[in-house]
Amino acid sequence: MRKRKPWKFIFILLFAVAISLGVYVYQQQYEPDDLFVKVGEGILDNAPEIFSGEPKEVRELRKQEVADTDTQGLRQEYYFGQLNEEEQRGYREIIEGIRAKEKEFYLTIYEDDTVNRVYHAVLMDHPELFWVHNRKQVYKTTFSNANYCMFSPGYSYTDEEIQEIQAAADNACQEVSALVSEGADDYEKAKAVYTYLIDTAEYQESEDDQSMAGIFWRRQAVCAGYAGAAQYLLEYLGVPCIYVEGSTAGSTEGHAWNIITLNGNDYYFDATNGDQPEFLEGDAVQLAEHKTILYDYLCPFPEEYEMTYTPSAEFTVPACSATDMNFDVLNQGCFDSYDYQEILAYCQMRLNNGAAVVRFKFSSQEAFEQARADWINGDAIQEAARYYMTIYGMSQVEYHYGILENMKTIYYMF
């Protein structure tokens, strides 16, 4: 005969008591019809999440209208225009989350390529979001069978540092504005920004070199910092400008530059290379006192620039073809053919105007080679040097030369 286990009776007794209490509570709180309504309402309220699997935050995001332009009116958002409707919604969600400095937030996009493309568009359109990590340092959480994700951009600075950097950027806007005369056209504004960036910063790798923070705060940056700062200042002055990333011929390193719009035409703008006097071949590069601004990269000849730099295929960029706003063209220093007397007269005119640097450019390789044979390998410069001594009453003068081969330009520094 099997023994009965007393704990089974205890369990049954407790279960019966629990049922009784439950019925009692139910009877005390609700009538049967009321309870049915309460349960029904709960199911209806949560039906979208129950059946779609989406959190309430995601469903709210999908209901929001997508603004066609920057809600703060700060940027032209060139790359936003190249996104499809779904991507544009994700673009706005990313900007809202970053501006609020949220550590993580939902996106209604989720595929890796899509999130990466949209985030890249945000970064290139918005240099003012300097406190966010680049796209190699973000984290994304996806969910099984879900078409949304949790995005964690990561931030580079404390709130105090962000305030310091923004104050430095605001100060830069005021300083560059002071360089622009009232009624200045867009080319004059572009030249002022180009000159300001080169005079302000040094090309130098640092922890802050990938954004405008490096330029305005640390005064050191690489191409990404220069291009972001240029975009920030030019858009502040009302000059249409976009940020461009691409590759460098003969190098594994990428490069960043800008494209600006002047009088309806598009031009390259590369302040990084303008701040690279070591690009010059010749003894002038050894002169510490000569930090020569290379204006060759302010509206350069497109075919010359494109021999070295190619934009990424991820997005399309405007085609540049005009040469009329090139620095040398505007200053009558670009020549289609070589004539010694013509070049000498140009040098004398520049020296008469007080120039310490004389530069001249050629539109053809043949003319450039002829000039190099006379002015670099020959002694054509001697006549210009004698003219310089006559102007300043000197018995001797020291001069140095530089050549920018890819731009077919010759420099002399007195």
Where are these regions (language model features)?
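N-terminal accessory/pre-domain segments preceding catalytic cores
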Residues: 2-182, 299-414
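A short, structure-level motif marking secondary-structure boundaries and short turns
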Residues: 103, 214-217
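Sequence-level motif detector for i,i+2 pairs with an aromatic at +2
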Residues: 146-148, 188, 264
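Secondary-structure boundary elements
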Residues: 158-215
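Periplasmic OmpA-like peptidoglycan-binding domain that tethers envelope proteins to the cell wall
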Residues: 217-224
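Hydrophobic/aromatic-rich core segments of domains that either
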Residues: 225-300
